[in-house]
Amino acid sequence: MPSLAIVDLHGGRPNTAVAALSAYGEANRAEVGVFDAVGGTFPRPRRFDCYIVTGGPGMPDDSAPWRVRVQAAIPEWAKSKPVFAIGLGFQLMAAAYGWPVRAPQVSRDGVFPLTPTPAGWTDPLMKDMENATPVLEARTWGVLSPPAAPRSGAVVLAYSSAGDVAAARFTKHAVGSIFHPEARLEGAASTVLARFLMGALEGT
């Protein structure tokens, strides 16, 4: 049976994201494991076919051991397995690959339109997205484009209406979004996770 690890960054706080993400995995007939990373629980290496790193209330510059460990683990997982990161998880993924992560002038909490880039329109996860697709954001930090084109081939897939990065692909296996695709909204945002899981679990 294919397997999905959900790396939960909510620190035990009530949320609807983990249940929604688990439902996506189960819909794809995957064995789902949920790991409280803030509490120090992590997936066993090479045990899972793909990973989703959730959002959460923490800060991407937190000096706590869990933040350091998650940020270091993401590129290790992505060396061989697909990883999708959301919200805070996306900020940690971006930082792990050397992209600037900054606190914006105002927090973003609500539904906002995004703008896909040409790379986004051709990316297998984002190709359903249109200009002004509504997405849910709940954040006080943002990811900025790197000052120079990354040699790794990393690309911005979409920009938020605030002008920072809404989604990016850092490597073949490492991709994520500042918005929450697990939130059910009108538009194509929820297809991002469905496409990620179909691609990650196909043939496993």
Per-segment meaning from a language model:
Residues 13, 41, 60, 92, ...:
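Flexible, glycine-rich phosphate/dinucleotide-binding loops
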Residues 16-19, 46, 65, 88, ...:
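Generic recognition of short, well-ordered alpha-helical segments
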Residues 36, 58, 89-91, 141, ...:
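Catalytic metal-binding/acid-base residues of hydrolase active sites
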Residues 1-78, 193-204:
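N-terminal beta1-alpha1 cap of cysteine-dependent amidohydrolase-like domains
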Residues 54-120:
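Cysteine-nucleophile active-site neighborhood
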Residues 97-170, 174-187:
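Pocket-forming structural segment of enzyme catalytic cores
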Residues 35, 86, 177-179:
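Short glycine/serine/threonine-enriched helix-capping/active-site loop
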